[in-house]
Curated annotation (Swiss-Prot):
One of its GO terms (cellular component) is cytosol. The lineage of its organism: Bacteria, Bacillati, Bacillota, Bacilli, Lactobacillales. This is Triosephosphate isomerase. Transmembrane segments: none annotated. Belongs to the triosephosphate isomerase family. The active site is at H95 (electrophile), E167 (proton acceptor). It comes from Levilactobacillus brevis (strain ATCC 367 / BCRC 12310 / CIP 105137 / JCM 1170 / LMG 11437 / NCIMB 947 / NCTC 947) (Lactobacillus brevis).
């Protein structure tokens, strides 16, 4: 059984004080983790504060990125080893904004995936799709290649634990979500790619999320799809009330 995962990605938003206020506001308002798992990826500056404030909570505190080396002369980077020692369970890898603004290549993303696994955490691997590639009919080739490249050299034992997010960049921050059918199509394609690389059994156990303008008013339709196991929400995860609604989508 795949436990739904409702995850937020704050990107470069909020202050330490606001992060603590968010944790306080959602306490007792989220489902139990064995029913619906919830997580928020936050800037590295806030992680320890959030972990401390959330000591008794069900919310998972996640990282937005990390480097592929555990330590060394890499000014400004975040060590995956340090994240693990802090108690961070998830790290986002391969978000379209990291690919676009920081020139992260498939090779870099693959090395980051392996670093996250090496340090006992779980990657939330993001797969991008541009509108140009969708209209040009290159969607399948593009998404398959991203998944395959990110998992190069990753064992089946590790791959079975990964979370993959289908995030069409034409929907991110646009206010226009993919339709539930489009989300299902993308998530199904990712699952089939995992089956081709590893096995049907492994693919059927991996959680695949949808991300891109997810809101309380469209999450129920997305979560009704058989291959959509959760969401990776951006803007709607910044507001406490909105995030609580996302997490409790079954009541909407």
């Amino acid at each position: 059984m795949r436990i739904p995962l409702i995850a937020g990605n704050w990107k470069m938003n909020k202050s330490v004080t606001e992060a603590r206020q968010f944790i306080d506001a959602v306490q007792g308002q989220l489902p139990q983790a064995d029913v619906i798992e919830t997580a928020v990826a936050a800037p590295a500056l806030f992680l320890q504060t959030m972990l401390d404030a959330n000591a008794e909570g069900t919310l998972r505190v996640a990282a937005e990125t990390c480097y592929y080396e555990d330590e060394g002369a890499y000014t400004g980077e975040t060590s995956p080893r340090a994240l693990h020692e802090m108690g961070i369970p998830y790290t986002i890898v391969g978000h379209s904004e990291r690919r676009r603004y920081f020139n992260e290549t498939d090779d870099v993303i693959n090395r980051k995936v392996q670093a996250v696994f090496r340090n006992g955490m779980t990657p939330i691997l993001c797969c991008d799709e541009t509108m140009g590639r969708r209209t040009a009919g290159e969607k399948i080739h593009w998404v398959v290649n991203q998944v395959s490249a990110a998992l190069k050299g990753v064992s089946a034992e590790d791959a079975a634990k990964i979370v993959v997010a289908y995030e069409p960049s034409w929907a991110i921050g646009s206010g226009t979500s993919a339709s539930s059918d489009q989300a299902e199509e993308g998530c199904y394609l990712i699952r089939q790619t995992l089956a081709d690389i590893y096995s049907d059994d492994l693919a059927n156990g991996v959680r695949v999320l949808y991300g891109g303008s997810v809101k309380p008013d469209n999450i129920a339709g997305l979560m009704a799809k058989s291959n959509v196991d959760g969401v990776l929400a951006g803007g709607s995860s910044l507001d406490e009330t909105s995030f609580i609604q996302l997490a409790n989508y079954q009541n909407l």
